[in-house]
């Protein structure tokens, strides 16, 4: 009974902290630098019966997107478990380039995809939080790990997250098999939301990284600061 009471008290304290988030939210972040790169991650959930049509559209979009002015990266990946789910990762040199894309080819893609989807197109716009210069994905049968991290927007939680995230990025890039490890921060009213993107030469290398003591410690230290599941999903390049 005592353990149940302790668990209930802990849950109530966390709920109370989250309820007061609007009153204690971190100070508003400055407007993004219009000349800084814009990082976009979009999640796509196709109807299973329409997966092939979705894949065709996404491949066409990837080819065209890479040729647009200001595009620095356009990658499309397919989830390894639920293969009707996809993610698009784009980097644009500045806000002007992104807005031009969003108003043209980006809007056209959404219109074409809409009848094929099982849930709405989910686009997340970010700034770079812990990133390296945009580069092409390494060759081979690589594995992408994309993780959404939702930090509780209360200073006692939010202020502790950046040092943990920065250290995890710096350490992870040194691990065998890592081709990219970057952390993005959403803009405007969702600055407590982060996206962690990793590329590994194969799944075995990813699993070795996940089993390291410091990786486990990072997740243990981060867990009390987040308000949702540590949502890691594995993908392969759409081919």
Question: What is each model feature region?
Answer:
Residues 43-45, 89-91, 150, 197-199:
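Short hydrophobic/aromatic beta-strand micro-patches
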Residues 8, 29-34, 60-75, 91-124, ...:
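An amphipathic, aromatic/His-enriched active-site/gating alpha helix that lines ligand/cofactor pockets
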Residues 45-56, 150-161:
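Short, surface-exposed ligand-recognition loops at beta-strand->loop->(often short) alpha-helix junctions
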Residues 24-36, 75-85, 109-144, 148-152, ...:
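Glycine-rich beta-strand-turn "strand-cap" elements at beta-sheet edges
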Residues 7-17:
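Bacterial N-terminal signal peptides
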Residues 19-22:
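Sec/Tat signal peptide C-region and signal peptidase I cleavage site
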Residues 1-4:
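Positively charged n-region of N-terminal signal peptides that target proteins for export
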């Amino acid at each position: 009974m005592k353990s149940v009471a302790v668990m209930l008290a802990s849950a109530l304290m966390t709920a109370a902290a989250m309820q007061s988030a609007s009153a204690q939210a971190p100070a508003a972040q400055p407007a993004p630098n219009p000349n800084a790169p814009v990082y976009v991650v979009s999640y796509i959930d196709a109807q299973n019966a329409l997966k092939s049509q979705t894949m065709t559209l996404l491949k066409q979009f990837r080819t065209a997107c890479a040729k647009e002015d200001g595009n620095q990266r356009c990658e499309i990946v397919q989830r390894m478990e639920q293969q009707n789910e996809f993610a698009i990762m784009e980097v644009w040199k500045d806000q002007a380039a992104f807005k031009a894309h969003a108003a043209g080819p980006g809007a056209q893609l959404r219109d074409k995809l809409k009848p094929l989807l099982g849930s709405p197109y989910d686009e997340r716009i970010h700034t770079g939080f812990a990133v390296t210069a945009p580069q092409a994905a390494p060759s081979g049968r690589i594995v992408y790990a994309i993780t959404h991290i939702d930090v509780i927007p209360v200073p006692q939680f939010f202020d502790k997250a950046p040092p943990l995230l920065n250290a995890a990025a710096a350490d992870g890039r040194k691990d065998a098999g890592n081709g990219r490890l970057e952390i993005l921060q959403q803009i405007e009213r969702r600055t407590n939301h982060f996206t962690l993107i990793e590329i590994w030469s194969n799944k075995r290398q990813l699993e070795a990284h996940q089993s390291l003591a410091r990786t486990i410690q990072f997740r243990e230290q981060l867990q009390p600061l987040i308000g949702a599941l540590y949502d890691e999903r594995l993908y392969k390049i759409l081919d």
